[in-house]
Amino acid sequence: MDKGEGLRLAATLRQWTRLYGGCHLLLGAVVCSLLAACSSSPPGGVKVVDRNGSAPAAARRTPVTSGQYIVRRGDTLYSIAFRFGWDWKALAARNGIAPPYTIQVGQAIQFGGRASTQPSVAKNTPVVAAPVATKPTPVPPAVSTSVPAKPAPAPASTTTPPSSGATPVVAGPAVGGWAWPASGTLIGRFASNGSLNKGIDIAGQLGQPVLAASGGTVVYAGSGLRGYGELVIIKHNETYVSAYGHNRRLLVREGQQVKVGQSIAEMGSTGTDRVKLHFEIRRQGKPVDPLQYLPRR
């Protein structure tokens, strides 16, 4: 209410007390509170909003913090951390897994309780091996370290038309350590609510190069994570990893060192309904908006 309404209400309350008596002290306190509230309210109903941190940089996805996961064939510590929303270092500490962070089929990865000092292995627990993608032949050095001289052509007119909000993107030189992982049309953006898209989607042509967005080590190459198809995960440092999903064919293997701009896969549609690259950047296990890191287009 405004100050005028507060004064009118105070007059009404005083008249009521003269008629019915009693409760003077209580009503006086109420009147003072109302007047103080009115005088401190911003004019025009303006709402004061703290802009600091109002736009979340990462999807608010809470990591799994209870239960356990039994390691299957093809799993790595990094792929398990990626799947369940953990920072790989924290998950390693929780389970007492020391560098080089090797895990075994049948090992129980704990998400709850206290950090362990010894890795635990499930006993008498049947383990169903997950399908394992055939490991691709490593790219010869002359090819693996090269960067395409010019971007791949835009999607042909016969492909599915992009949405009205689609934005053309072109792979190019790295800026601030990051480069676009593919050329094509930006058809999906990062979102921390609703559909919860934890990265961006780039539509392109079947078989076109998918490039490492920054240098690092391949820590996962396979198809064991539901919803990602043929997936590559690259560890860049102790803080950041990047992921490249829905590929037709993988050109790198786990443990391989890659450089920014190196071809790591061929774009495809595995695990989805159209040819596209799903690209994510994760900071300490949390998805962040790749557009805040990639060069502006």
Swiss-Prot record:
Q: Which UniProt keywords apply?
A: Cell inner membrane, Cell membrane, Lipoprotein, Membrane, Palmitate, Signal
* Signal peptide bounds: 1-22
Q: Name one GO molecular function term.
A: metalloendopeptidase activity
Lipidation, kind S-diacylglycerol cysteine: residue numbers? C23
What is the annotated localization of this protein? Cell inner membrane
Membrane topology of this protein: Lipid-anchor
Q: What is this protein called?
A: Lipoprotein NlpD/LppB homolog
Q: Supply the source organism's classification.
A: Bacteria, Pseudomonadati, Pseudomonadota, Gammaproteobacteria, Pseudomonadales
